Amino acid sequence: MGKIIGIDLGTTNSCVAIMEGNQVKVIENSEGTRTTPSIIAYMDDNEVLVGAPAKRQSVTNPKNTLFAVKRLIGRRFEEKEVQKDIGLMPYSIIKADNGDAWVEGHGEKLMAPPQVSAEAVRKMKKTAEDYLGEPVTEAVITVPAYFNDSQRQATKDAGRIAGLEVKRIINEPTAAALAFGLDKAEKGDRKIAVYDLGGGTFDVSIIEIADVDGEMQFEVLSTNGDTFLGGEDFDQRIIDYIIGEFKKEQGVDLSKDVLALQRLKEAAEKAKIELSSSQQTEINLPYITADASGPKHLNLKITRAKLEALVEDLVERTIEPCRIAIKDAGVKVSDIDDVILVGGQTRMPKVMEKVKEFFGKDPRRDVNPDEAVAVGAAIQGQVLSGDRKDVLLLDVTLSLGIETVGGVMTKMISKNTTIPTKHAQVYSTADDNQGAVTIKVFQGEREMAAGNKLLGEFNLEGIPPAPRGVPQIEVTFDIDANGILHVGAKDKATGKENKITIKANSGLSEAEIDQMIKDAEANAAEDHNVRELADSRNQGDALVHSTKKALTEYGDKLDAGEKEALEASLKSLEEVLKDTSADKAAIDAKVEELGKVSQKLGEKMYADMQAQQAGAAGAAGAAEGAAHAGGAQQAADDVVDAEFKEVKKD
């Protein structure tokens, strides 16, 4: 069996590693570097360049040089973050037939983000094969912890397109924790925070490393993040600043010039890196553009203080997810033993300072932020291949559920539940003789389904006619170790079932998941009111249904006046339920009124039941007397002596 390689498929850079015995090896690519730019260029002669060669020619071929495609993977074209990127990217982002955000490269050719990302994966595969001297067919690929189901599926697809069987998708912070934990000699339980600020995404995870009978157990206690915040956004702030300064000085807007934009991107990234180790840098771009007066040159000094002012709010945005992660993990900041920084952007002094300020301790400097994730993926690959037995990884998921009556989000699996996991619950129909149900699957923290992200839906048909509430439909949520969701629904009476693996085309947008959690906290009162209104409506619907049924069976036992009052109250409740603007108080008042008016009907039903029971008891007494009369003879005739053995069913 060949080795399972570990791939960190990053927004800005990618990296590949393998395990050799118990030693990890981060493999150098054909250009001699241990990280490869996640840049893909499509040339006129159909050649595809990946990494440094693609980056080198980007200035002269901006429309066919694709970068930061990971920000689009598993996303819908309409999402505001995709729309924002359309104005910033020199290449074209197009709406595909299925509504996804695709890219245009190599002339008019449309490509899906997994297809483009597959080129970077293929480069990592080739890098490993060149080093090992044998084919590589299996890999563990990492994703941001806050990637949703469709984004994970799209990443898995990228691996498959590249010719790899993706054995596991694991979260980047978890992979970094694996790399850190196995490299340290400290014994005993430790709680660590992994702060992962990469090129396009931000994650924070609180992870407990425990020594259980010689086995290292990595348990993710909580995770949080922002899937549209990263180094690319820091670069963009510098680009916007340069464009503004140049326009003030020269009166020329560089934002409309794709060639100039590509040069600015390169210069901004270089300046940002230099300002991590020096207080000032100079951006010098001769012949950046030209107008009627001749060529224009760009020369601009930027200080570290200026950069920090430009990105201050971006750095600040990373702190709220840290607070939520600490709270969700049920720990205090003081309980954290180590803070690990992952992602190239964490080299920025301002980021380190902010992390130290929040966690109250210096982050560890002995973890390579560019390589730790790939190293962790390689370790997980060794575990999956059976070559390593002393590591157990317990990762977590986000909240998942289905929409139930009244638009309520009924959670099947709560956030930060350890995966793999499975949960089943029985639901029923909302209407009489309902022949089919639609199962809508959502991801998010809001109480009402509409406030969450729809991942997918499917129908269960062929339910036999029955009154509402009678059919039993078992819905099962099953999340595998990759964090990919499988949902099934089964009618327990007929055995009919339907199931899907959620492959929603959309991906969660910039702070959509993050926003869901914030909204859930900020709008808790509003959500509670909406939930209570839905409950009142459901209660009203149920009362209307049961009252109508009782009227049909026992209405003739009521006086004309009683029946008329009951029907009027029933109609009044039905009208208020039809009124979409009716509030909870109005519905509750009508429910209470109908409850009082229908008491007489209840009394008639109860009296009727008692009469039936009395009649049944009288008939039973008569039968018993007859039995005594012929007792002995009947016993002799009907009873057979026999041995018996009790068989217990499992």
Curated annotation (Swiss-Prot):
The modification Phosphothreonine is found at T201. Induction: By stress conditions e.g. heat shock. Pfam families: HSP70. InterPro entries: ATPase_NBD, Chaperone_DnaK, Heat_shock_70_CS, HSP70_C_sf, HSP70_peptide-bd_sf, Hsp_70_fam. One of its GO terms (molecular function) is ATP binding. Gene3D superfamilies: 1.20.1270.10, 3.30.420.40, Actin, Chain A, domain 4 (3.90.640.10), Substrate Binding Domain Of DNAk, Chain A, domain 1 (2.60.34.10). Keywords: ATP-binding, Chaperone, Nucleotide-binding, Phosphoprotein, Stress response. Belongs to the heat shock protein 70 family. Acts as a chaperone. HAMAP family: DnaK. This is Chaperone protein DnaK.
